[in-house]
């Protein structure tokens, strides 16, 4: 279950109902997908082949199709980041720069953890700490950045309206 940390007042929201309500009020789509259906050989696997990535997409194909039909998403892929990723530190530096996109930024966490820091409607940033099974859609034009948690590893399904609209604007 995702958790929220509000930056300026360092308050945490950990209750599932309160997390969902907070994100809904901020215009952030949040869903919990059934991660238990992921085959064992893909759990906590950060060295994925193209076949592994295709299998992950197949496992969650119904959920991807459902959210895509509701929200107008047209493309998806799988990304894996870990300490074995070449230039991980350089990638994280870029990810941690505040930016926005002209399309939603959608991520479903398959393994590992990630944090989206999002500027709220009142101008205060809040972290959404994500774990396996969490899907988030950062709204278009919302200022945000992404980083990894202390384990420095994540596998995520990325879902796009268009890949062109997903280019970061700093």
From Swiss-Prot:
List the residues marked with site Important to generate the dianion: 107
Instruction: Quote the gene name from the UniProt entry.
Output: mtnD
Record InterPro entries: ARD, ARD_bac, RmlC-like_jellyroll, RmlC_Cupin_sf
**Pfam families named in the record:** ARD (PF03079)
Q: Which organism is it from?
A: Bacillus cereus (strain ATCC 10987 / NRS 248)
Assembly with partners or alone: Monomer.
Per UniProt, the keywords (alphabetical) are: Amino-acid biosynthesis, Dioxygenase, Iron, Metal-binding, Methionine biosynthesis, Nickel, Oxidoreductase
UniProt catalytic activity: 1,2-dihydroxy-5-(methylsulfanyl)pent-1-en-3-one + O2 = 3-(methylsulfanyl)propanoate + CO + formate + 2 H(+); 1,2-dihydroxy-5-(methylsulfanyl)pent-1-en-3-one + O2 = 4-methylsulfanyl-2-oxobutanoate + formate + 2 H(+)
Q: Which residues bind Ni(2+)?
A: 99, 101, 105, 144
Protein's UniProt name: Acireductone dioxygenase
| E.C. number(s) listed in UniProt | 1.13.11.54, 1.13.11.53
Broad enzyme group: oxidoreductase
Tell me, in a sentence or two, what this protein's role is.
Catalyzes 2 different reactions between oxygen and the acireductone 1,2-dihydroxy-3-keto-5-methylthiopentene (DHK-MTPene) depending upon the metal bound in the active site. Fe-containing acireductone dioxygenase (Fe-ARD) produces formate and 2-keto-4-methylthiobutyrate (KMTB), the alpha-ketoacid precursor of methionine in the methionine recycle pathway. Ni-containing acireductone dioxygenase (Ni-ARD) produces methylthiopropionate, carbon monoxide and formate, and does not lie on the methionine recycle pathway.
Please list the GO biological process terms of this entry. Answer: L-methionine salvage from methylthioadenosine; L-methionine salvage from S-adenosylmethionine
């Amino acid at each position: 279950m995702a958790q929220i940390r509000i930056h300026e007042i360092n308050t945490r929201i950990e209750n599932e109902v309160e997390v969902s309500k907070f994100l809904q009020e901020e215009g952030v789509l949040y869903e919990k997908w059934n991660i238990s259906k992921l085959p064992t050989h893909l759990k906590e696997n950060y060295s994925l082949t193209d076949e592994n990535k295709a299998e992950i997409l197949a496992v969650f194909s119904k959920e991807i199709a459902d959210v895509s039909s509701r929200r107008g998403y047209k493309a998806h892929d799988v990304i894996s980041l870990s300490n074995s990723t070449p230039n991980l530190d350089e990638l994280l530096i870029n990810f941690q720069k505040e930016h926005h996109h002209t399309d939603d930024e959608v991520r479903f966490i398959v393994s590992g953890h990630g944090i989206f820091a999002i500027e709220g409607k009142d101008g205060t940033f809040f972290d959404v700490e994500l774990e396996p099974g969490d899907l988030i859609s950062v709204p278009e034009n919302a200022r945000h950045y992404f980083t990894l948690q202390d384990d420095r590893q994540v596998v995520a399904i990325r879902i796009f309206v268009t890949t062109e609209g997903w280019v970061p604007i700093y």
